[in-house]
């Protein structure tokens, strides 16, 4: 008989939580899980390479992508606007990847963007991922169009 058991939310729900609340520890762990799944090793370097390889295999332009870690906290990481847009577009259209798009923070409502864009007719139409370091603040995501469709 079992001495103990552990259960958790499905990974897509954990990823949605990570994105919505900018949980850097979970971000790093998702990089590690990617590397381990790909049998790439067990280090920050193999984590970042596994993530970059996975993005490229999905047809996402990774030109100029530099990842110092998977959390985004270590100085030296760079990502292009093209890479961010292609990731958002894929997340909106690629089956299970839609959980990543749906898990983004909603300005005025939930997550790290809950105190941004809190009033007005556009409230609730944006889903965004916030980011900030000492000298940088960023925002990437998508917006629902009034007449249908989504823009990244």
Locations of the language-model features?
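A small/polar active-site loop signature that marks catalytic segments
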Residues: 1-98
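C-terminal soluble interaction/assembly domains
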Residues: 50, 62-152
């Amino acid at each position: 008989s079992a001495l103990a058991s552990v259960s958790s939310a499905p990974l897509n729900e954990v990823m949605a939580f990570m994105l919505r609340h900018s949980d850097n520890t979970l971000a790093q762990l998702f990089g590690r899980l990617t590397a381990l799944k790909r049998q790439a090793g067990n280090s920050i370097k193999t984590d970042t390479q596994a993530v970059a390889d996975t993005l490229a295999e999905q047809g996402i332009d990774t030109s100029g992508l530099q990842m110092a870690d998977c959390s985004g906290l270590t100085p030296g990481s760079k990502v292009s606007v093209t890479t961010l847009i292609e990731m958002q577009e894929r997340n909106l259209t690629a089956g299970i990847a839609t959980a990543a798009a749906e898990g983004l923070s909603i300005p005025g409502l939930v997550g790290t963007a809950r105190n941004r864009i809190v009033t007005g007719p556009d409230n609730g139409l944006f889903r965004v991922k916030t980011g900030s370091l000492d000298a940088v603040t960023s925002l990437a995501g998508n917006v629902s169009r009034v007449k249908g469709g989504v823009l990244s």
